[in-house]
Regions:
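Repeated loop/turn-to-beta-strand initiation elements of outer-membrane beta-barrel proteins
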Residues: 74-77, 123-126, 163-171, 204
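Outer-membrane beta-barrel translocator domains and adjoining extracellular loop/strand segments
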Residues: 41-49, 89-100, 136-149, 183-192
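Membrane-embedded beta-strand positions of outer-membrane beta-barrel proteins
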Residues: 29-33, 79, 114-116, 126-130, ...
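Short glycine/proline- and aromatic-enriched beta-strand/turn motifs that initiate or cap beta-hairpins
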Residues: 18-85, 185, 189, 193-205
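N-terminal signal peptide c-region/cleavage motif recognized by signal peptidases
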Residues: 12-14
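Feature captures outer-membrane beta-barrel proteins of Gram-negative bacteria and organelles
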Residues: 66-68, 112-119, 155-163, 192-203
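Surface-exposed loop and membrane-interface regions of Gram-negative outer-membrane beta-barrel proteins
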Residues: 52, 82-109, 115
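Positively charged n-region of N-terminal signal peptides that target proteins for export
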Residues: 1-4
Length: 205
């Protein structure tokens, strides 16, 4: 692991050394942080809970990390890690969409994937990632109480604009749509969520 980290650091250093100012080439690192509106739903598949759902709609914290490199001018391929943390309590609803209970639990959608980001001449850019999605559910104030789903499928797409803040650094804003779905580990229900967010971006390229 130590050799891998040293090799990655050496690659990043050499990429920056040959990268031209105000161009999208070489090493690529993108960090984002912002807010989103997330719609989360858990639909029971088990007969004894038929018609019951768990829902959590509201404001979420939304953050991304993308790391990779440019394979052509203005085109970067990267690994993507995204987390959308729902700040709303989860609600249990019956078959008539009536709330029958409110829990002290919150949900997060996590995406691990591969993606691409392309920059246009005016530093407008589009980005997309596809990969595995996982949901975690925790009690508010107690991270040890809760659980996680099986791995499912998820994606993220976005469009944004950046301005140069240095020879290799860019700052800007990004709008994203993130989606994920997965079965729970007990196989009695399916989770899914989408989030529409606006985030600030910081890019080293």
């Amino acid at each position: 692991m130590k050799k891998f980290i040293l090799a990655l650091a050496a690659l990043a250093t050499s990429a920056l050394a040959i990268s031209q100012p105000h161009t999208h080439d070489g090493f690529f690192l993108n960090l984002t942080l912002g807010m989103s509106y997330q719609n989360f739903g858990y639909e029971y598949k088990a007969t004894r809970y038929e018609g019951m759902t768990i829902e959590g709609d509201g404001i979420s914290l939304d953050a991304d990390t993308k790391i990779g490199g440019c394979v052509a001018p203005n085109l970067a391929l990267h690994l993507t890690i995204t987390e959308v943390q729902n700040l709303s309590d989860l609600e249990l609803k019956d078959e008539h969409e009536r709330t029958v209970a409110t829990t002290n639990q919150s949900e997060s959608l996590i995406l691990f994937g591969f993606g691409a980001t392309y920059y246009f001449l005016d530093n407008m850019f589009v980005t997309g990632s596809f990969g595995l999605s996982v949901f975690t559910i925790e009690e508010v104030g107690n991270s040890r109480a809760g659980g996680a789903s099986e791995a499912g499928i998820g994606f993220q797409v976005g469009v944004g604009k950046e301005w140069w803040a240095g020879d290799e650094w860019g700052m800007g804003v990004l709008g994203t749509l993130t989606y994920g779905s997965a079965d729970d580990k007990d196989d009695i229900g399916e989770m899914s969520a989408y989030a529409v967010g606006v985030k600030f971006t910081l890019t080293l390229n």
